[in-house]
């Protein structure tokens, strides 16, 4: 019914706003009016699990906090939404129980620098030292008797790495993850965490075992370890790793509510099978995207020249293809990455940076509302509302650890600016608002208990785990806002 009504109203009130009506006119109830809302597309709109990310990608030395934020300050404030820490376990816990968030002053400054700039945190903590400047696993694990092997580090170094199924390694890592979750299972400051990080670079490849028959068992152990400790943060894993997507889906996605990440965008490493999985999983799980090529932005270093699928001639070509993959396959995030890559993106492809600021991830808002402007005390009235997502991705409200916590709501504020009452539309589901689709809803609200007087209607997407306070920025143009609520119309109760 509402789709027909809304189509009628959009036709009759095109180009107008706050259109009044008489009883039944144009299908709008007596005492109600149609309100046409415009999206604010003026710039950065931060929301959880979306947008550009800045990195400390510590295959070399970890970043110096003061130098890092001096270089990344502008990008952090103008473009980015999250700060991704990809560190060795040996940096996060160099000695048993000596955690970086307690004892490492540089680490604490890096984290605080992100939070001070309004960025959420994201993490991958890995144990394998391949291509690293130093060992990925703390030395105390080997000293405790864990068995391992050597991988190739930087400068031809041989770096010890534990077998993934070694019981001592597993015991020590479980202890670390429990402490890690105690500090960071907090959606107020953390967006997502990589809940599988074995193998080279933490991407699930070239994993070695004491018993190769334990691959699936070890994968289950690792993902269980993270999922039992992190109850409030979305967990993701690199998909199509060597264990195979069927196992990833069965154990991590279906059983434990994991999302996906792909670290090979803009390259031959993003395969047709990767594309197929991304298409199949869009709207079902969060998908985190990352460019394959990094480490430079000038002709002095061009690792993409060996790409057998794309004939890249410059870093700008790489940026174009990476952006296209993120847009086409609906990845919620993309990486400005470290200082070097940020210079490349912002210097060579500023138009792509801005496009992803405006359209990366999700950007949702109510396009149209039909609601009362007057009613009698105690009356039950209806509110009809239509929502649109102009982003490439989606709002992953259906992820297990979010558990549908975000919902559209309308509220009445009195003349002093105090919130009197709010009503959540439980049937309106933001995770269903896929790219450039509209979803329409109608629900009834009771004005029982609200005194006669003048009020203002406001709209928000609230977080049910935070006492129904606004939790998602919706960006409506030319409307007054207060504490995350956007005022859209006046209301009189007689």
Labelled PLM ranges:
Residues 316-371:
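Catalytic cores of secreted or luminal carbohydrate-active enzymes
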Residues 83, 180, 193, 226, ...:
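Conserved, mostly hydrophobic/aromatic
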Residues 358-494:
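Extracellular/luminal regions of secreted and cell-surface proteins that mediate adhesion/ECM remodeling
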Residues 72-152, 215-233:
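Aromatic-lined substrate-binding rim segments of carbohydrate-active enzymes
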Residues 28-68, 79, 115, 192-202, ...:
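Catalytic-core regions of glycoside hydrolase
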Residues 1-7:
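Sec-dependent signal peptide recognition
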Residues 148-212:
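Active-site groove signature of glycoside hydrolases
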Residues 10-35:
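Bacterial Sec-dependent N-terminal signal peptides
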